[in-house]
């Protein structure tokens, strides 16, 4: 019994470690970390630093973008200017998501206003945002004819908008790569299956012992009953 308890405790520790594992990727161009003055988490007013330009791989139709945002009294005023090749007649779907508390909380904001041209698209959003917001993500889907559930975002434009002090930013803002996320999910699923196997085996042994004790026909009992 002690061996199974130790195994369960070890599995729980591994689960907690994987759940809280962070991957800062400090050199990732997707994120812009503040380097001015430290700020407390959840302050209602925030003015983003000057917009920076980001480059995308040549395979994407989106080449670069600039972003700026201001959070005042808990209200976000953000603008994304995206350069690339667009087809206004085919339409484009834009979604804005937010994440906070090391990825433990996330959600989706209102759809931004879109002004799409052949070489540039401008997206504006003004909405109340939660106090524990860390960064925003603009998802662009270059079609509107297909159903939304089949329309997966093709371009992900991220812009840091709101957060903690500089020391916490490298710990808070991270993103799993697809391979690493797959490995983590596979390990967690394996631990779930192993835990289910251990529980099922324990239940089977307990039920078997109970049945043999109270319901099985033991030879001595059968002989006495026949007598």
Curated annotation (Swiss-Prot):
It is found in: Host endoplasmic reticulum membrane; Host Golgi apparatus membrane. InterPro entries: CMV_US. The chain crosses the membrane at residues 179-199. GO terms for biological process: symbiont-mediated perturbation of host defense response. Residues 1-21 form the signal peptide. It holds the Pfam family CMV_US. It comes from the Viruses. Keywords: Disulfide bond, Glycoprotein, Host endoplasmic reticulum, Host Golgi apparatus, Host membrane, Immunoglobulin domain, Membrane, Signal, Transmembrane, Transmembrane helix. Disulfide bonds join 69-151. Belongs to the cytomegalovirus US6 family. This is Membrane glycoprotein US8. It comes from Human cytomegalovirus (strain Merlin) (HHV-5).
